[in-house]
Regions:
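Active-site cleft segment of glycoside hydrolase catalytic domains centered on the general acid/base Glu
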Residues: 65-71, 95-209
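Active-site-proximal beta-strand/loop segments in catalytic clefts of secreted hydrolases
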Residues: 10-13, 47-49, 87-89, 141-145, ...
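N-terminal substrate-binding region of glycoside hydrolase catalytic domains
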Residues: 1-78, 83, 91-115, 213
Length: 213
């Protein structure tokens, strides 16, 4: 992945297609990934939510990005020559600076257990992808983690836990897929002071990473 990355998040594409979305190039209907490839796209971002369904099995929508959809998108992309970034939210739905809720299954876990869960889950996902020959070129450990992840244990006022949780994910990536680059992803790229504060705090405590997103 040394070439310039030109990509997009296509996580909602299968759900959009199922709801009737159609894609066109100069008036001719075509496959969205093929159209994007034609115009120079070379990388896909695909998010993964732990369990994006309610207790009675209803999908949360907005992509309902479970493992099955990840495999379908990654497979379609690989066939067309795309690289892809795996975006691990460690949540059942959108994780962002305003909400970083752990998965339902982890809701009552303490910090030690959460650290183990992150490692085990990340490792399990990557091992499954490895068996399918679908390992990603890059793994994003957490999504928009400016204010931490898996609240309340991983809120910004507990940087030690944030570093523990992220590092657990990184260790799993390095173990299973050492050729995958590791990205840490904030939402405040235009705020130099906040980014410096965050990364200064993290690098004193956490595992090494490769890319800032």
């Amino acid at each position: 992945m040394d070439k310039f990355i030109k990509g997009m998040d296509v996580s909602s594409l299968p759900e959009e297609a199922a709801l009737g979305a159609r894609f066109y190039d100069e008036g001719k209907e075509g496959d969205a990934l093929e159209i994007l490839k034609k115009y120079g796209a070379n990388s896909l971002r695909i998010r993964l939510w732990n369990d994006p369904y309610s207790e009675d099995g209803k999908p949360y929508s907005a992509g309902t990005n479970d493992f099955t959809k990840l495999v379908a998108l990654a497979s379609a992309g690989k066939k067309l020559g795309y690289n892809y970034l795996l975006d691990l939210h460690y949540s059942d739905f959108w994780a962002d600076p305003g909400k970083q809720f752990p998965p339902k299954e982890w809701a009552y876990a303490d910090a030690d257990t959460l650290e183990k869960n992150v490692y085990d889950y990340t490792k399990d996902v990557l091992l499954k992808l490895k068996r399918l020959d679908l390992l990603p070129e890059m793994v994003q450990v957490g999504n928009e983690i400016t204010n931490g992840l898996m609240w309340p244990h991983g809120k910004w006022d507990n940087v030690d836990n944030i570093a523990r949780f992220i590092s657990a994910g990184i260790r799993a990536v390095r173990e299973v897929s050492p050729d995958s680059r590791v990205m840490l992803h904030l939402d405040c790229g235009g705020n130099n002071a906040r980014c410096r504060e965050w990364f200064d705090a993290y690098v004193q405590r956490g595992e090494d990473f490769d890319v800032i997103g």
